[in-house]
Amino acid sequence: MDITLLLTALILGIVEGLTEFLPVSSTGHLIILGDLLGYNDEASKVFKIVIQLAAILAVCWDYRERLIKVAVGVPSDRSAQRFVGLLLLGFLPAAVLGFLFHSTIKNVLFNPLVVATALVVGGLIILYVEKRAYHPRVTSVDEMRWGDALKVGFAQALAMIPGTSRSGATIMGGLIFGLSRKTAAEFSFFLAIPTMLAATVYDVYKNWTLLRVEDLPVFAVGFVASFFAAMWAVKSFIRFISNHTFVVFAWYRIVFGIVVLATWQFDLVSWSTP
């Protein structure tokens, strides 16, 4: 087994886990790093599905008590039914757009230059949102209205553009629509479960012929790295936003995006282009 490939899997797994639930775009980071590390062949498509699944399972594990309570209560508990309804409503816009444009978006927009541009634009939007007067109307997911979930769902649909960040779009959308920081972040985490599971199932369906037994050790390394990195990131992020704004993530996005664009402009790196 190629040690370099295993190390690449470890790096990408950690990056996926750390960035999946932060407003910095995990997909964008994987596209850029995959291109930089030369891991963008057919097998890499399946690998990215595997490490994304690991991140989903990590957030399920972190919130297992809440999720089990909801699952058990769905048949008879109105609050559990309402919670599931909020998630399904928030999931709907991305589901429809993903079904219609999934292949087009992946074929046309999944390249480092689009990602870098989206990182910068998204960072500027975060700075704008943070400068607005902030008076949260909703302080827990249970207080959310149906309209809140749908509006956050439309914000999530914007994140189909790589580099935008699904969590960034949903959290910033939540803040704009009156959710508290913690509520916006937690709803973003919960909303990730049906959204990412659906995307994972669809990607597996489209790419299952690319699965090879010899790739399993690489996938296993990436899966484990992503799972534990995501577990740590989710807990740390919730603690962080209790006392901080998202400005640091905005500047990180802007600087990272500008660096990638500069390396392309001055031919320092041969990035893949459409």
From Swiss-Prot:
The keyword Transferase does not apply. The keyword Nucleotide-binding does not apply. Keywords: Antibiotic resistance, Cell inner membrane, Cell membrane, Cell shape, Cell wall biogenesis/degradation, Hydrolase, Membrane, Peptidoglycan synthesis, Transmembrane, Transmembrane helix. It is a multi-pass membrane protein. It catalyses: di-trans,octa-cis-undecaprenyl diphosphate + H2O = di-trans,octa-cis-undecaprenyl phosphate + phosphate + H(+). The chain crosses the membrane at residues 3-23, 43-63, 83-103, 108-128, 157-177, 184-204, 218-238, 246-266. GO terms for biological process: cell wall organization; peptidoglycan biosynthetic process; regulation of cell shape; response to antibiotic. It comes from the Bacteria. One of its GO terms (molecular function) is undecaprenyl-diphosphatase activity. It is found in: Cell inner membrane. Its EC number is 3.6.1.27. Pfam families: BacA. GO terms for cellular component: plasma membrane. InterPro entries: UppP. It is an enzyme of class 3 (hydrolase). Bacitracin is thought to be involved in the inhibition of peptidoglycan synthesis by sequestering undecaprenyl diphosphate, thereby reducing the pool of lipid carrier available. Catalyzes the dephosphorylation of undecaprenyl diphosphate (UPP). Confers resistance to bacitracin. Belongs to the UppP family. This is Undecaprenyl-diphosphatase. It comes from Azoarcus sp. (strain BH72). The gene is uppP.
